[in-house]
Amino acid sequence: MKSFLLFLTIILLVVIQIQTGSLGQATTAASGTNKNSTSTKKTPLKSGASSIIDAGACSFLFFANTLMCLFYLS
């Protein structure tokens, strides 16, 4: 049972990090890959959910993850 809770906790952490973008794909190119490119002003993409909408789900998952860690350690 404890190993299942540990596995579920790790999965939730990975899901939260992918959702918030820390493990997601970067939108910027690596520096120095193309020396002939010109610098232009790029507008941010308007796709995806806003951070206000994601805040509720992320806080819920954070508290659920914390509770699972406490149950695992007890």
From Swiss-Prot:
Membrane topology: Lipid-anchor; GPI-anchor
Major place of residence: membrane
Gene field: Cd52
Glycosites: 36
GO CC, alphabetical: plasma membrane; side of membrane; sperm midpiece
Sorted UniProt keywords: Cell membrane, Glycoprotein, GPI-anchor, Lipoprotein, Membrane, Signal
Signal peptide (from-to): 1-23
Lipid attachment, kind GPI-anchor amidated serine: 47
Region Disordered: start-end pairs: 26-47
A single BP term in Gene Ontology: response to bacterium
Pfam families: CD52
Protein name in UniProt: CAMPATH-1 antigen
Coiled-coil portions: none
PANTHER family in alphabetical order: CAMPATH-1 ANTIGEN
The protein's role, per its UniProt record: May play a role in carrying and orienting carbohydrate, as well as having a more specific role.
Tissue/organ expression: Expressed on lymphohematopoietic tissues, including thymus, spleen, and bone marrow, but not in liver, kidney, and brain.
Propeptide residue intervals: 48-74
InterPro entries: CAMPATH-1
Cellular location(s): Cell membrane
Biased composition (Low complexity): 26-42
